[in-house]
Amino acid sequence: LLNALNSGTAIVSYIGHGSPYQLAQERLLDMNRGDINRINTGNKLPIWIVGTCSFGHFDDPISESFAEELIREPMNAASMVISTTRPITVTGNERYTEDLFEAIFFNNSVSESKVGILLQSIKDGTSEAQYFHLLGDPAMQLPIPKDTLVNINISPDTLKTLETGTYTGIQNITNSAGYGYVSLLDADKDITREYDIQSETYSLSYTLPGATLFRGQFSFSDLSISGQIRVPEDISYSTKPAKLLMYINDEQNEARAVINTIQLAGGEATTDNFGPQISFENMNGTRLEADDHLIENDNLIIRISDPLGINLTNEPGHEITITNLNLSNSLIVTDDFLYDQNSITTGKIDFDINDKFIHLKVKAWDNANNPSEKEIKLFRTEENKLKIYNVFNFPNPFKNKTQFSFEVTQDFDLKLDVYSLGGRRIKSIEKFNLPAGFNVLDWNGRDAFENEIANGVYIYRLKAKMVTQLYHILVVVQNINE
């Protein structure tokens, strides 16, 4: 539940037992346990529709209800809460929430009415209707796209494992270029659980969404939309159809589309037995290798690529995992993977880690279920200290040119001075407003007058400068002219 909340959802709906402080006897959410502090939606604020007893008991001067605490969270947790102020019966609860959702999705479309108007439209004078209140701004509209993409098609009509499908459509919300998101979901799963209670056996049946088979981004330059998806081997082979979900937006408008008639089937086997390529980058896109440095407060970018695509189904044993080898604990991060724009082979995970010394192992699977692992050790730099790390030049010795590479902890101005062994400065190179992290600088091996320098050993000094700090380092370079 918390993962779904923090990832972003439009509506949180609950019907069942509860109180002003918790949902369900099993403590699905518990205010006294501090669960509100674990909700981190950011600006992705959902509407809560909670059909349970007294969840929104706002007129109790002695204590605060869960609904009140949710709505008080600054830019977090909830945009509004619709819930009860008193105990409510099961039938009344069910009837009212059913009426509310019928008003929200009137005639199988999303209502354009303000939420306060929707709520008022189903107030029928019954006690159950009187118990439900809106905590929030009644003039707000539903956080669900009203517009739809049109003429959405996918070909072929049956998608086979390890093969690609092409989707097309028309958007009419913007005349400019933009981008959107696309997901392919496996068939819904019918679940039945049996419980033995006091020598009686009870069954509970429900439906869960199918596994995510693809999750990516696409771009468009006009009204037409098109892109590709790839199907993994790990499908359910259900007779039910799969779904394609699409979403686009600009600053003012958003639109969505669903195709829920896609058939999936087994495809041809592959001879590919190589797993994905795994690499690491900083937030500037610079590739990181063992013992490199990551700037303080920067996330680590984990890039994963494979010609057959990456397995995103989260099937047991086929998840994308990150193991913190310092703590010997693992996280399943499959849901954090997103394909690059217009790609069906390469994507990334934006991983937040604050360790001073980073030691991770990443494991991922391609769509043919070939695994790969990659381990890396990194050092975290201190943001308030200007330092230069890992200064090298290559080739060294050099003939006609060489390239200097180095890491700097903060944005900086650079000055490179090259000296003879006698202390004479023969060349200076300056660069300004360079970004923190890994940088390179080329030198053609000539002096300040563009003359070739003599064979021999030289010393260079690298200076990184900020307004208040200066850091420099001396290194030896050798020149060989034939």
Which sequence ranges carry the predicted segments?
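Catalytic-core segments of thiol-dependent peptidases
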Residues: 1-61
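Active-site-proximal C-terminal subdomain of hydrolase catalytic domains
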Residues: 51, 55-156
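Short, compositionally biased P/S/T/A/G/V-rich stretches that sit at domain boundaries
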Residues: 134-170, 265-298, 305, 381-397
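Beta-strand-rich binding/interaction modules
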Residues: 162-200, 314-317, 414-418
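Long, low-complexity serine/threonine/glycine- and acidic-rich segments characteristic of extracellular
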Residues: 183, 190-264, 282-285, 295, ...
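A structural signal for beta-strand boundary/capping segments at domain termini and interdomain linkers
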Residues: 255, 369-373, 425, 450-452, ...
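C-terminal tail/sorting-segment detector
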Residues: 377, 384, 451, 455-482
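Glycine-centered coil/turn sites that cap beta-strands in beta-rich domains
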Residues: 379-422, 428-432, 440-443, 464-471
